[in-house]
Amino acid sequence: MPTNFAAIVPGKNQSLVVQEAPYPTAGENRIVVRVHALAVNAVDYATQMMGETLFPWVTYPLVLGEDIAGEVVAIGPGVTRFKPGDRVVGHAVGTNSNNSAEGAFQQYVVLLENMASPLPHALEYQQAAVVPLAFSTAIVGLFQKDYLGLQIPSLTPTRTGKTLLIWGGATSVGCNAIQLAVAAGYEVITTCSPHNFDLVKSLGATAAFDYKKPSIRDDLREAFRGKTCAGALAIAGVVPQTRNEAAEACLNLVAESEGDKFVALSMPAPPNVPDGVSCKFIFASTVKDNEVSHQLYGYLGEALAHGSFIAAPEAEVVGTGLEAVQGALNALKQGVSAKKLVVTLP
């Protein structure tokens, strides 16, 4: 049996410590993956700093991390989509389950079968690792019935005639959401910084607007004139003012437009939600418990192989080995734009 090592959080607001960890076994509908690349996310450092204040069920020591790409080494009972030796990309849910065997920051991790996709050989592990958490967040907001409930993506989509607003198109979630919404048959209008306009349009957005412009709400209102709105997905960073502006702009746009009146939020709802409009905070991990994960992680493998889905944003490899994960988290706290920080494992 191989030896497993993990970057462990010993306690609340403590730095990661690399040490030997139990070698995991594949339970029912689960696979064990040898991690070749992992990405870091804001939820990782937030959980590291805040622990049970953020997630009351968290106990220590804990292995954090959500995004991995690697090779299947074992499959559990009931697994039909994978076999040992397969290349995969997947969303590790250890923070949600409070199960360190399912945390990404280690050499061998347990994944749910329905939270993983086959990885084509043409796509490097380090670039694939940017996808999972952002993908899960996007599919919850876009396709779960208790959120926007949009039509499911296809390699040959049927046009719906509706237009979706995605605020934050150059974020990791935004890059996934644009592609998914277009593949589901929706026109996408998005916001981002001007230097990312080409990026979001290359992913399928028909128009992009500068979210920092004082006229942004008027610009969006004009862009949606005469269109049927499919609702909005509001994605923003950790700065409270930016998050509030994003939520309010999306809610107001949906309220003023013809069409659906729902906004999926990556931030808490503001105090004054317009009459007739509904909104809900996105919990990405909820997708593991419903049909959307089966449908969309199945679609992801097909779309990656077909070349119709791009692993975006760009991966920036900031180190090699588990010892580099803490540095990656520290760098992420300083802020990044249109890229995702990745650590490779030898």
Swiss-Prot record:
- Which cysteines bridge via disulfide bonds? none
Q: What is its EC number?
A: 1.-.-.-
Keywords from UniProt, A to Z, are:
NADP, Nucleotide-binding, Oxidoreductase
Q: Which SMART domains match?
A: PKS_ER
What's the name of the protein? Answer: Dehydrogenase orf1
Q: Where does substrate bind?
A: L133, A134, F135, S136, T137, A138, I139, V140, A269, P270, P271, N272, V273
- The species this protein belongs to is Aspergillus niger (strain ATCC MYA-4892 / CBS 513.88 / FGSC A1513)
Q: What is the purpose of this protein?
A: Dehydrogenase; part of the gene cluster that mediates the biosynthesis of nigerpyrone and its derivatives carbonarone A and pestalamide A. The biosynthesis pathway begins with the polyketide assembly by epaA to form phenylacetyl triketide precursor from successive condensation of two malonyl-CoA, presumably with one phenylacetyl-CoA starter unit produced by the phenylacetyl-CoA ligase epaB. For the nigerpyrone biosynthesis, the reactive polyketide chain is released as an aldehyde through the R-domain. A nonenzymatic cyclization and dehydration may create nigerpyrone.
Give GO MF terms, alphabetically.
Answer: nucleotide binding; oxidoreductase activity, acting on NAD(P)H
- Which InterPro entries does the record match to this protein? ADH-like_C, ADH-like_N, GroES-like_sf, NAD(P)-bd_dom_sf, PKS_ER, Trans-enoyl_RdTase-like
Q: Name one Pfam family in it.
A: ADH_zinc_N
Pathway listed for it is: Secondary metabolite biosynthesis
Q: Which residues form a coiled coil?
A: none
Q: Which residues of the sequence carry a binding annotation for NADP(+)?
A: 43-48, 170-173, 193-196, 211, 251-252, 336-337
The organism's place on the tree of life at top rank: Eukaryota
- UniProt family annotation: Belongs to the zinc-containing alcohol dehydrogenase family.
